[in-house]
Each structure stands twice: as structure tokens, then as C-alpha cells.
Amino acid sequence: MAEGGFDPCECVCSHEHAMRRLINLLRQSQSYCTDTECLQELPGPSSDNGISITMILMAWMVIAVILFLLRPPNLRGSNLTGKPASPHNGQDPPAPPVD
């Protein structure tokens, strides 16, 4: 707790507020369900309508493939400028001198 008995966390999330949310949640669920059965669908997101997580992942994959194909030439790894890939033109480096 801070000085003077003031707790800044109490402004954001108080125990009373959490208990009110819990009680409201219980009251709402009691209007939909009894002890033995639920009379109708509970409110919430429906899996039949809207965009599913699979569609979102497929969209990201398509975007990734498009960005991969449209990347700039310097990131493609191909040697288009005619420069050698290694300082020894693909040959083994010379052996160090023996003393």
C-alpha cells in the first residue's frame, strides 16, 4: 500500500468490482441454464458465423508468400552483380606459411 492508505491499484481493479462482475455473470448464466439442462444457446461468439482462426492463418500465409516472392534482389541471395561469392572464387584458401 502507498502512503496515506491510498492504493492506486484499487482504482483500476477493486475487489468489489470483481465480485459484481462475478455475480452478474452468475445471474446471466442462471437465466439460460437450470440445474439439469440449458434451454438455449449461451450468448457469445458463434463458430458458424464470421471469420475463423483458420481463415486468418491462411490469409497470413498468403501475405507471407506474396512478400517472399516480391522481396528485393539484394535479399534473394542470388549473385546478379557478378561479384564472387567468396574471396577465393570458390577455391580453397591458400595454406598458411610454415615457419
Curated annotation (Swiss-Prot):
Subcellular location(s) per record: Endoplasmic reticulum membrane
Annotated transmembrane regions: 50-70
Main location: endoplasmic reticulum
Keyword Transmembrane: yes
Chain ranges on the Cytoplasmic side, renumbered to this chain: 71-99
Keyword entries, A-Z: Endoplasmic reticulum, Membrane, Transmembrane, Transmembrane helix
Membrane topology: Single-pass membrane protein
PANTHER family: SMALL INTEGRAL MEMBRANE PROTEIN 14 (PTHR31019:SF1)
Protein name (record): Small integral membrane protein 14
Record organism: Bos taurus (Bovine)
Lineage: Eukaryota, Metazoa, Chordata, Craniata, Vertebrata
